[in-house]
From Swiss-Prot:
The gene is RALFL11. Belongs to the plant rapid alkalinization factor (RALF) family. GO terms for cellular component: condensed chromosome; extracellular region. It is found in: Secreted. Cell signaling peptide that may regulate plant stress, growth, and development. Mediates a rapid alkalinization of extracellular space by mediating a transient increase in the cytoplasmic Ca(2+) concentration leading to a calcium-dependent signaling events through a cell surface receptor and a concomitant activation of some intracellular mitogen-activated protein kinases. Keywords: Disulfide bond, Hormone, Secreted, Signal. This is Protein RALF-like 11. Residues 1-17 form the signal peptide. One of its GO terms (molecular function) is hormone activity. It comes from Arabidopsis thaliana (Mouse-ear cress). Disulfide bonds join 34-43, 63-69. PANTHER family: PROTEIN RALF-LIKE 10-RELATED, PROTEIN RALF-LIKE 15-RELATED. Its main location: secreted.
Length: 72
């Protein structure tokens, strides 16, 4: 009796564990935050031209004429 029960459980497990069709890759839309329903700030709407980023701080060596720093 126990052997039949074990055989039945093995057969049921084999039927249930049948391979499921799935993709082996993630689509770009799933990882693109700007394509979602609530895009974060800084994302351009779809179809809009890409804006060139404006530099936040201009380069400065940290020494100006008013501070009388040594010049090279």
């Amino acid at each position: 009796m126990k052997a039949w029960l074990i055989c039945l459980l093995v057969i049921c497990a084999a039927v249930i564990a049948e391979p499921v069709e799935s993709r082996n890759y993630i689509e770009y839309g799933a990882i693109n935050k700007c394509a979602g329903p609530n895009p974060p700030p800084g994302c351009n709407p779809p179809g809009a031209e890409q804006k060139n980023p404006t530099p936040v701080n201009e380069y400065s060596r940290g020494c100006s004429k008013i501070h009388r720093c040594r010049r090279d």
